[in-house]
């Protein structure tokens, strides 16, 4: 008999997710069982952990399991566990809302492409709501461990905008999820179909999955029913890696991560000695939807002596490797370990160092063995890996080897060039690795600063990710070679520089008075004015000194709301350009000023992508064209 019944509306994001899921996941329906069994496994893990300090929570039943049964006549499948269970408040929090920041924005971003939506929703993690892929009504009966039998809760919904919740009596702790299948989903009301799905997705979770099977006597007559364990239910990571197949590793990854895609690669290691632990690390194929969300939870599952302790233990991985998935099972940490204890712990620090090294080795091996797969990985996680040089000084050189960039060596904008590739192609006498940063690949590719390098056939890395400038403030050299921006006024090409000819010397002297006129006109608005022979097609550029903040870094500061120090540019003019020659011959000071201002504004526009006063620029162009 239910009491205290109320009907509540789903959070708007839940409604939207349910509709998207029903229409986008029709080709992958069977994952509902994987998700619900994974939830049951999590509930068992949480009970084990809480029972460490309060054994009474077991209520005399410490054999944790999940049971799957079906009734073909009634059209229902039931998934029951004897795990931690839920209170009424927890039911409303967990089954009526999605407590993930950024969910609304994520759902809004989903388009009409159902195949793409399927993949994105898989990255989001649908969990309990996957039940509605096959069911037109879902009933949940649950009682939290340690609560009285009359403190159980009944939750029910048809997935159409609202749900009901009521108090009921339930003798056993844990949760029963009852699925009332749609008419066209009756294929799942079959013992062998359910066994197949459980074997495929849940064979190696650390919890027995049982099904009710018929018993027969010696004469072959049905004589009853019994619960039969149908999965291996061993902790996969405790087995020798030689005894685990690739398919088993992939299936376990999907259980662990709730991801739909296979991982790119994985590493399974058992370490003995001062630190005894087992790790199983995976590199995902796709970035999670909230990878760059500050509140995004990441980290490894932590076990101590095979006992689950916590999800998302971020203390074992640096932030720039937050995309890594997997688990660590330590023999040395105490069973009562907390996040606070992990924060300042020598064992944690040693494990973090070892797991970081292992993760980087996995990526190095992937880059070496399968360049195509590595580039797929780079497209998904390259921006995150670029955080590494600033965060991890000890592994900076290793991280630098894993970075990929666009370059003038290639035609496209794909980031495929490593620093090692670049060094192999360096010109004789070249001492630095040259790069340029810009707002976009197109802006970098067409920068006038490239003209001399293109003429000499010197490769330049084209950097256009927002993080690049910040990364390069920490990554200043690689393999003994300085990384040098080609937009700097004090750029030194060393042996690659052209020797000044007598003709150039005479021309420069002839332009001396012109340079002085420009300096007097611009005054304090620029640091200095000078001639340059680094341009071929462009009349003028602006550049900064090595000790000054670059244009891109100034933009980063401004975007972050930080105060931006004034940047004074060096104004460089090309004496061989016909426009500069024309301006140098203008006697009228007003006309001269207009042309100099125009050249400066053009150079500033090419460097910064914008002007402080675009209206004045347009007015000046119109005046000079008229």
Curated annotation (Swiss-Prot):
Sample GO molecular function, one term: ATP-dependent protein folding chaperone
A Pfam family assignment: HATPase_c_3
GO cellular component, one term: cytoplasm
Subcellular location, record wording: Cytoplasm
Region spans: C: 556-626
Location (main, coarse): cytoplasm
UniProt keyword annotations, A-Z: ATP-binding, Chaperone, Cytoplasm, Nucleotide-binding, Stress response
Sequence segments annotated as region (A): 1-339
Segments for region (B): 340-555
Subunit structure: Homodimer.
Entry similarity comment: Belongs to the heat shock protein 90 family.
Protein role: Molecular chaperone. Has ATPase activity.
Name of this protein: Chaperone protein HtpG
Organism: Haemophilus influenzae (strain PittGG)
């Amino acid at each position: 008999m239910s009491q205290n019944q109320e009907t509540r509306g789903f959070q708007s994001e839940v409604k939207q997710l349910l509709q998207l899921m029903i229409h986008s996941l029709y080709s992958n329906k069977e994952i509902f069982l994987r998700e619900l069994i994974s939830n049951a496994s999590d509930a068992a893990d949480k009970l084990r952990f809480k029972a460490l300090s309060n054994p009474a929570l077991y209520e005399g039943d410490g054999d944790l399991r999940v049971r799957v049964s079906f009734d073909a006549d009634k059209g229902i499948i039931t998934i029951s566990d004897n795990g931690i269970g839920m209170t009424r408040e927890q039911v409303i929090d967990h089954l009526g809302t999605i407590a993930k920041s950024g969910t609304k924005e994520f759902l809004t971003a989903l388009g009409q492409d159902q195949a793409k939506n399927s993949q994105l929703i898989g990255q989001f993690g649908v969990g309990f709501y996957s039940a509605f892929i096959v069911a037109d009504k879902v009933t949940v009966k649950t009682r939290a461990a340690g609560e009285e039998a009359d403190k159980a809760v009944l939750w029910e919904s048809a997935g159409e905008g609202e749900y009901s919740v009521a108090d009921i009596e339930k003798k056993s702790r844990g949760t029963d999820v009852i699925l009332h299948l749609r008419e066209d989903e009756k294929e799942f009301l079959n013992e062998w179909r359910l066994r197949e799905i459980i074997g495929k997705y849940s064979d190696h979770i650390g919890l027995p999955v049982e099904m009710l099977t018929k018993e027969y006597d010696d004469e072959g007559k049905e004589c009853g029913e019994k619960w039969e364990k149908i999965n291996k239910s061993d902790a996969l990571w405790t087995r020798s890696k030689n005894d685990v197949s690739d398919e088993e590793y992939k299936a376990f990854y999907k259980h662990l991560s709730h991801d739909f895609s296979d991982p790119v690669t994985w590493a399974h290691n058992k370490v003995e000695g001062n630190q005894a632990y087992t790790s199983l690390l995976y590199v995902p194929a796709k970035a999670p939807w909230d990878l760059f969300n500050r509140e995004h939870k990441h980290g490894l599952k932590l076990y101590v002596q095979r006992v689950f302790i916590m999800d998302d233990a971020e203390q074992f991985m640096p932030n720039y490797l937050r995309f890594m998935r997997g688990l660590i099972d330590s023999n040395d940490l105490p069973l009562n370990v907390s996040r606070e204890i992990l924060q300042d712990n020598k064992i944690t620090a040693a494990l973090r160092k070892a797991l970081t090294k292992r993760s980087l080795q996995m990526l190095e091996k992937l880059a070496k063995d399968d360049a195509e797969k590595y580039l797929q990985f780079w497209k998904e996680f390259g921006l995150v890996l670029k955080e590494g040089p600033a965060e991890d000084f000890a592994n900076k050189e290793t991280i630098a080897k894993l970075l990929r960039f666009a370059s003038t060596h290639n035609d496209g904008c794909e980031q495929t060039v490593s620093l090692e590739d670049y060094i192999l192609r360096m010109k004789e006498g070249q001492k630095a690795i040259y790069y340029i940063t810009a707002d976009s690949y197109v802006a970098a590719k067409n920068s006038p600063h490239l003209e001399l390098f293109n003429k000499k056939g010197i490769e330049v890395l084209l950097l256009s990710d927002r993080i690049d400038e910040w990364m390069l403030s920490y990554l200043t050299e690689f393999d003994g070679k300085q990384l040098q921006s080609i937009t700097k006024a004090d750029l030194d090409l060393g042996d690659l520089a052209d020797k000044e000819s007598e003709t150039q010397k005479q021309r420069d002297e002839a332009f001396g008075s012109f340079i002085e006129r420009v300096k007097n006109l611009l005054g304090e608005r620029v640091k200095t004015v000078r001639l340059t022979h680094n341009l071929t097609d462009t009349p003028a550029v602006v550049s900064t000194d090595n000790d000054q903040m670059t244009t891109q870094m100034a933009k980063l500061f401004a975007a972050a709301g930080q105060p931006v120090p004034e940047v004074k540019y060096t104004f460089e003019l090309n004496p061989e350009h016909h426009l500069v020659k024309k301006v140098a011959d203008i006697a009228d000071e007003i006309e001269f000023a207009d042309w100099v201002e125009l050249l400066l504004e053009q150079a500033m526009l090419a460097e910064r992508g914008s002007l402080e006063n675009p209206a004045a620029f347009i007015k000046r162009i119109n005046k000079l064209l008229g």
